[in-house]
Amino acid sequence: GLGDVYKRQTIAITSVYYFIAARIILGIGEAGNFPAAIKVTAEYFPKKDRAFSTSIFNAGSTIGALIAPLCIPTLARYFQRMGVGNGWEMAFIVIGGLGFIWMGLWIFMYKKPDENPHVNAAELAYIEQDKDNEEDKKATTPTTKDEKSISFLQCFKYPQTWAVFFGKFMTDGVWWFFLFWAPAYISDVYGFSSDTPTAQMLIFVLYAITMLSVYGGKLPTIIINKTGKNPYAARMQAMFIFALFPLLALFAQPLGNKEVFGEQAYWFPIIIIGIAGAAHQSWSANIYSVVGDMFPKSTIAAIVGIGGMAGGIS
């Protein structure tokens, strides 16, 4: 909601200070998206499937990064040809309006599984399968068996909260570094301006590779089905595997040397960085899902929000 207000009010920005204020509103509005999404995932999926479902919607940000550079300029040029301002104002209005429609759908259509008439008995039984699974009631949870609610300040009393905090603090910077540094790297090292077809193709391939993270979210489910491990242990094993892949980024610059590997050596760092980014997103999907293993559903959004704050600080 607040994010959509930002998009629409951007057309009224006439100074840097207004822009900063608008960005603050956007940040406040965006901050609730992931905590809410993780909580919905915990309500609609059993523990073994949560990382996979999280990796799917987590990939949505990558899809948006691929589509936005194509859609927004096209909208702006269309409205400019129609004589509606400079074009970009209406682009903000259209995107903001779509956001309000999306918000309305969530407000009026979302219901918990046991209250949703579109969820049948078999689906509800699958969603609630963890209730009867004693193996999943591990000592890792900081709450009593009735899963009482925990206040926001009380969350900081538990070591599990700090594990999520430092996990996000130490890793989110990697993703944002790859995301924002890659275009500058392509421009500085290989001389491709961001508006050239080659640069756009490289960025497209980079983002497309990161979407492999969807399969990374499936790995814990595979481990559970093959080994019989509980979801928490399976996620820890998967996260360890994913944590090793970003080390490949150490080879990105040496393999991108044009003098050694030819004029098209730029494909090596692009592919390597894409794989590292996909591994990070897979790791991130699992740490979000771990929150649901350690805390009751009523507290998941707060813990994920704390982790998101840590990632933002990094």
Tell me what each language-model feature is:
Residues Q154-V214, H280-S284, Y288:
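Extracytoplasmic gate region of multi-pass secondary transporters
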Residues F57-P113:
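Helix-loop-helix hairpin linking two adjacent transmembrane segments in secondary transporters
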Residues A51-A76, L206-V214, G308-S314:
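Glycine-rich segments within core transmembrane alpha-helices of 12-TM secondary carriers
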Residues A22-A59:
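Cytoplasmic helix-loop-helix junction between adjacent transmembrane helices
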Residues Y17-I25, F268-I275:
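Paired small-residue
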Residues P113-F165, V189:
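Juxtamembrane intracellular "pre-TM" segments in multi-pass secondary transporters
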Residues Y232-N286:
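C-terminal transmembrane helical hairpin of 12-TM major facilitator-type secondary transporters
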Residues G1-Y6:
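Short, small-residue-biased leader/transition segments that mark boundaries at the very start
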